[in-house]
């Protein structure tokens, strides 16, 4: 109740905070997007005249030679807030997802997710719920298992740029919490700070800053209780023009990653990347990546 009153006090509407999984996402994107080390990857997105979206993805691991692929079809029935999704991958796993949003209550999304593997006969089911409004973002998922369901819950509160979140998982088969995470952060238009504690033993933090319209930077830091090793990394992304950008990152293990993304034409994007081991430049072991995205 106190949260609701606090949200009504300002004259201007407060922003909806991100979900717990999206806390610190801007910094993670600078570290992860624009790279594809050790992979040759092709992504194709198309949309039919009837509104059905098709997404096909295929990748080959240059080290192992293993090829993975997936196909996803999605249809949105906007009038009723419904989304139907069918998935398949090369592990021969079939998935079906039905989501309904903003129909039962504004800001509430319910998702029914099932998977089935014909090869093994393994089945899984999950019910997901998410509710968001000014200052508040809640989530609760129930993952069904023969041994007993697992309940995943999360909550994020936001006020004047400050964010506080909690995430938990309760395993009913073991009758105990198997995940217990806390997070605190601060977010403005061009600056974000995020810190988290996972299970009381893993600590992490990240900083994201948009220095200019063309330059974005990020820093991350992580360590584990009882260990003297600290993981540290810095990354940056620079837009050369409206069609091209370069990315670079380095961590305390002397691993240097570089990436180049070029939009060749509308709907065609090429990504080149390389990972260099700074400790053994002459010994080899470096990785290259090639990605092509097609959208029509």
From Swiss-Prot:
Q: Give one GO term, molecular function aspect.
A: cholesterol binding
On this chain, the residues bearing N6-acetyllysine are 33, 122, 279
What keywords are assigned to this protein?
A: Acetylation, ATP-binding, Ion transport, Isopeptide bond, Lipid transport, Lipid-binding, Membrane, Mitochondrion, Mitochondrion outer membrane, NAD, Nucleotide-binding, Phosphoprotein, Porin, Transmembrane, Transmembrane beta strand, Transport, Ubl conjugation
**Highest taxon of source:** Eukaryota
> Phosphothreonine occurs at which residues?
120
Which GO BP terms sit in this record? binding of sperm to zona pellucida; mitochondrial outer membrane permeabilization; mitochondrial transmembrane transport; monoatomic anion transport
Q: Which reaction does it catalyse?
A: chloride(in) = chloride(out); K(+)(in) = K(+)(out); a 1,2-diacyl-sn-glycero-3-phospho-L-serine(in) = a 1,2-diacyl-sn-glycero-3-phospho-L-serine(out); a 1,2-diacyl-sn-glycero-3-phosphocholine(in) = a 1,2-diacyl-sn-glycero-3-phosphocholine(out)
The UniProt PTM text for this protein says: Ubiquitinated by PRKN during mitophagy, leading to its degradation and enhancement of mitophagy. Deubiquitinated by USP30.
Please provide, in alphabetical order, the Gene Ontology terms of the cellular component aspect for this entry: acrosomal vesicle; mitochondrial nucleoid; mitochondrial outer membrane; pore complex
- Subcellular location per the Swiss-Prot or TrEMBL entry: Mitochondrion outer membrane; Membrane
Q: Which residues carry this modification: Phosphotyrosine?
A: 80
Sites where N6-succinyllysine occurs are at 33
Q: Indicate the transmembrane segments per the record.
A: 39-48, 52-60, 67-77, 82-89, 93-102, 108-117, 124-133, 136-143, 150-158, 163-171, 176-188, 191-198, 202-211, 215-224, 231-240, 244-251, 255-264, 267-276, 286-295
Write out the residues that bind ATP.
Answer: 25, 33
Q: Position(s) of the covalent cross-link Glycyl lysine isopeptide (Lys-Gly) (interchain with G-Cter in ubiquitin)?
A: 25, 33, 66, 74, 122-123, 174, 279, 287
Pfam family of the protein (one): Porin_3
**Gene3D superfamilies in UniProt:** Porin (2.40.160.10)
- Where does this protein hold NAD(+)? 255-257, 273-277
Q: Phosphoserine: which positions carry it?
A: 26, 206, 253
Q: Where is this site: Involved in ceramide and phosphatidylcholine binding. Critical for channel structural stability and gating?
A: 86
Give a short account of what the protein does: Non-selective voltage-gated ion channel that mediates the transport of anions and cations through the mitochondrion outer membrane and plasma membrane. The channel adopts an open conformation at zero mV and a closed conformation at both positive and negative potentials. There are two populations of channels; the main that functions in a lower open-state conductance with lower ion selectivity, that switch, in a voltage-dependent manner, from the open to a low-conducting 'closed' state and the other that has a normal ion selectivity in the typical high conductance, 'open' state.
Q: Provide the domain comment.
A: Consists mainly of a membrane-spanning beta-barrel formed by 19 beta-strands.
By sequence similarity, the record places it as follows: Belongs to the eukaryotic mitochondrial porin family.
How is the subunit organization of this protein annotated in UniProt?
Answer: Monomer, homodimer and higher order oligomers; formation of higher order structures is necessary for scramblase activity.
Name the UniProt record assigns to this protein: Non-selective voltage-gated ion channel VDAC2
Species per Swiss-Prot/TrEMBL record: Meleagris gallopavo
